[in-house]
Amino acid sequence: VEPVMHFAQPADGDSTVKKTPEFIATMTGWINEQNPAGLAWRQRMTYGRPELGAVPETISAPSLVVSGELDPSSNPSVMRPLAERITGAEFIDIPDCGHFSAVEHPDTVARALLSLVKRVQNAQKNA
């Protein structure tokens, strides 16, 4: 589990939430509960995934792209252009948030997801 333990260790530039003892304890616990084989698969998947190519332009369903402004791997400068490639996608940029947006700012993510559900329901009614 050591190769991913850095997710539980705050660094300069991390969100306020990620620097709290509660976040550190929660994330450390979650990581320690994982099967090492599953973590190895996750690492291989992350580094071996292909580029998206033209896939985003083919998405026609209501979509949501969420990004934490402090996310080192998928921050708004990466995710906003992705959202712009998806017709009708909503983009949410969460201030003072890193990679674990649903853990760091659960209320913001929940509101965004509820909004997406309403958009899906409206699309179904109008189909």
Model-identified regions with their sequence ranges:
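Generic recognition of short, well-ordered alpha-helical segments
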Residues: A54, S77-P81, E104-T108
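Hydrophobic "lid"/C-terminal helical patch
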Residues: M27, Q43, L82, V109, ...
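Catalytic active-site module of serine/aspartate enzymes centered on a nucleophile-bearing elbow/loop
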Residues: T87-A127
